[in-house]
């Protein structure tokens, strides 16, 4: 169920200049980066790109969701890492993205880790936003 404006706890604001070949910065100055297309897409690869920024945001958000689920389940995920791989390619509408999420949870058996990751995928705001729109594989 979508949230309403009155439900918002925090709003991030970022402004891009010159799209994929420019810069992007947040209004608070916490992020100010050069953006360039990767070499695979004809760019010089000298800066970051939207796919890297999306992967960074998704992995951090998913890690937070994993922590919430782990606390509810009484599991210790303090040494866990989450990696998001975001690919971009052509589709019938122009371009689309695909995501792979993997988590390493030391000290937790494989079945429990898998269950935690699947539960995190249900509550992660990025997962909710992408559900039904792009392919997201849990590895």
Predicted regions and their residues:
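Extended beta-strand/beta-hairpin segments
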Residues: 1-56, 63-139
């Amino acid at each position: 169920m979508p949230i309403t404006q009155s439900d918002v706890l925090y709003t991030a604001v970022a402004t891009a200049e010159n799209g994929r070949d420019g810069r992007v910065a947040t209004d608070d100055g916490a992020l100010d980066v050069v953006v360039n297309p990767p070499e695979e897409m004809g760019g010089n690869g000298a800066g970051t790109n939207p796919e890297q920024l999306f992967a960074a945001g998704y992995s951090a958000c998913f890690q937070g969701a994993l922590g919430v689920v782990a606390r509810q389940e009484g599991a210790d995920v303090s040494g866990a890492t989450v990696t998001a791989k975001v690919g971009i390619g052509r589709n019938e509408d122009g371009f689309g993205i695909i995501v792979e999420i993997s988590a390493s949870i030391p000290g937790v058996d494989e079945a429990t880790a898998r269950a935690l990751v699947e539960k995190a995928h249900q509550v992660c705001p990025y997962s909710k936003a992408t559900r039904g729109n792009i392919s997201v594989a849990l590895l």
